[in-house]
């Protein structure tokens, strides 16, 4: 059937992959680079902060952040991210994607630098100031989620759209690798010059005074990538879909996208008026609920469930690694040595499990499809977490630490090659232009709500490192993944279709309309029957 789409939208959908697609991935991905860098670093830094600021000589044990303080240090950025997602997602639909896009990077740069400058006359002031700036860092990072996903989906062609959106998200993998290298390099440099004694030998000076500079340098370096891409982000034009469909300026959309694609595009004023009038419904309307209600429930629920498991893995790595035997006992090493060993273990797990998973999705999402990849990821994560939970006593012994590490790494691989990527991609494709950024924001905010369950619930539960608690936590995470597997059936496959065809905006077949067919069967659309 012939498409009712505008010329400018058809040109975007059928364009060959060009250099601007690659530059858009890098420019849009810097927020996720910073997000992953911060998440990776803070888990390790929180242990160092405990040794620096919370040493109690009466306990004869290395300093450790109190549960509540640790939860806020690691979790406050998640609260900021959730808030930023909702605010900037809504602004992206109301004011335009580009108008608020630069502000997110400015927030990231300022707050990353300020986090490293969290000085004070007491530990309460230092931690309080750090949490304040980490909230606003998260606020900026959160704004990048809906804006970057929406911009990339509206720029890309329909044949490779999923791969490019996934590539934006895969910049998290690059951020993780960079964070690991920075942590290891900075801590090693200070170790070479200021190495302290083991805690068992000297309780006070096993925590090197110079270590107070280490965590500050690491946090401040997170501002560098965002700063380097600010100029190029400001040079990007507004997306053709927003300019044409929302602003109603077909001529400007044709000019902007013509420059990007290096072709001439004819504007269609009369056709645009009909196009706009057929799709003028709001997020809270019955029309939206009939077309996309279950899809929104599906994207929100799967992201929520995924992030409970995913952030629990990331935030509790520092506690699980000693049990796995990948990090020395805290009493046998100095503070900087502990930081180096923890970051090294996290780096190896990320390099072998997390990083390949992101790029597996980039290369195979257009071949396998979003729906199948998400189902596979949830299912395999559940299996491996259940094995760890059931056999934890066996796996935690020294003789089986590498089996433990392999199983733990595989959960990261299938998270990133599955739902961690697809839950980001699908909300950028399923919903109409008028509410695309807002719907992605709602889905992403649900994910961060799950991450907060992890930070303030699962992490606190396992912080003591007690075996029976870690076993129960892993089995709980296995269960949440199976629920995510079931909720995946609420979304539909989007592979190979234009955004307007998926959302029904071009009025061809209104394929996502749900009257008389509650689930627009991802399994049916994807040929599973």
From Swiss-Prot:
Similarity comment: family membership: Belongs to the major facilitator superfamily. Phosphate:H(+) symporter (TC 2.A.1.9) family.
Role noted for this protein: Low-affinity transporter for external inorganic phosphate (Pi) probably involved in the acquisition of phosphate released by arbuscular mycorrhizal (AM) fungi during AM symbiosis.
Positions on the Cytoplasmic side per record topology: 1-21, 93-99, 146-163, 233-291, 366-374, 427-472
Segments in the Extracellular topological domain: 43-71, 121-124, 185-211, 313-344, 396-405, 494-529
One of the record's GO cellular component terms: plasma membrane
The keyword Cell membrane is assigned to this record: yes
Pfam families: Sugar_tr
Lineage of the species this protein comes from: Eukaryota, Viridiplantae, Streptophyta, Embryophyta, Tracheophyta
Induction field: Regulated positively by RAM1 during arbuscular mycorrhiza (AM) formation after inoculation with AM fungi (e.g. Rhizophagus irregularis and Glomus intraradices).
One record GO biological process: response to symbiotic fungus
Glycosylation site list: 314, 510
Protein's name in the database: Low affinity inorganic phosphate transporter 5
Gene that encodes it: PT5
Tissue expression remark: Expressed at low levels in non-mycorrhized roots.
Region annotation (Disordered) ranges: 500-529
Keywords attached to this entry: Cell membrane, Glycoprotein, Membrane, Phosphate transport, Symport, Transmembrane, Transmembrane helix, Transport
Organism domain of life: Eukaryota
One MF term in the entry's GO annotations: symporter activity
